Amino acid sequence: MKDAKNTFQNIHYNRQKPSFCLKVALGVGEFFYKKVINLKNFLYEINFLKEQKTDSYVICVGNLTTGGVGKTPIVIDLANELAKKENIAIISRGYKSKLSKKEAHIIKDFKELKFKNGSLCGDEPYQLAKKVKNNVVVITCPNRKKAIDLARIKFGIKTVVLDDGFSNRKVKKDKTILVIDSKMRFGNEHLLPFGPLREPISEIKRADEIILVNKGDENIDEARLWVEKFDKPFKIATFEPKSIYNLQSKAQVVNPKKQKAVAFCAIGQPSQFFDFAKRYYALPETVSFDDHHGYTKKDIKELVKVAKRNKTNIFITTQKDEAKLKCLVDDVSGYSFNVMELGVRIEEQ
């Protein structure tokens, strides 16, 4: 399964050419997917399908592609900035959450985080809840309207941020922000399953603003010129490592001095994290799991084997992964599981 996912991702981003038979199969799949997506958007445009209005001001932060573009840190930054003036709610669908999909769930209220780790509520909602200000509520529900209504009725919140909602047109948005990876962009520019696009590129017309994410891209000036062709206001978000801390003790790791470590993660674009990790550690081996992978004790045992093979007792992973690891590594003696925190700086253009 993992090999198949890697194959698709390589095809999506022009790192591998599909065989003739696979190309035909993917092309047929894309043809029917495109028909469905175009029909959906057409029905919304002629008001046959109607976007549900809410009593809240709704800001959507989304993307056109599958995989990680760096949306979560941007949602955190936006919510914390808005929270300087009023109470805010972040609404997430709760992808890979084990909670009931029929109800809206409060992951964090004004007082506390309701879950000890992300294994139950989902890694991204947990990460959001840990990093936002006290007056930011985090709620999950596939039914965004239900979650928005809960935020207003229970907490009196008037402004909500939808974490990933560009393709979901059931709720009317007051502002739509589209996040694009400056390096990966739209890959081969094909729709699923042939490419990474969930929506046609032409649907950028629905965005009010674009945030171009720079994760150490040397060609950011060229990317800036590329995004200008969409004729939308845009900003550039630059990601940089902010700190490294030990997951077990929470102590800061100061100047790792290129110690040997095993880097691992379960995110959409693992290579970008590994590039950051190489600035601080010598990485004899890296391990990538499927995006949103739920870690098990067996996974930890396998990681320890990798570390032993490479004669190190240090691991480095992401904050997104931290949410699912805490309950698994506390009793792993003799090994340090370190977490890299990324900071984001957003600049007007």
Where are these regions (language model features)?
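Residue-level signal for inorganic ion chemistry
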Residues: F32, T72, L128, D163, ...
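Acidic beta-strand-to-loop metal/phosphate-binding motif
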Residues: N313-K320
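Short, flexible loop segments at boundaries between secondary-structure elements
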Residues: D290-H293, S333-Q349
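A transmembrane-helix-recognition feature enriched in membrane-embedded lipid enzymes
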Residues: K2-Y57
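Conserved beta-strand elements of the Class I
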Residues: A89-I91, L178, K260-F264
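Walker A (P-loop) phosphate-binding motif
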Residues: N41-E112
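C-terminal accessory "lid"/substrate-recognition subdomains
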Residues: M1-Q16, R185-K311
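Phosphate/Mg2+-binding loops and adjacent switch elements
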Residues: Y95-K229
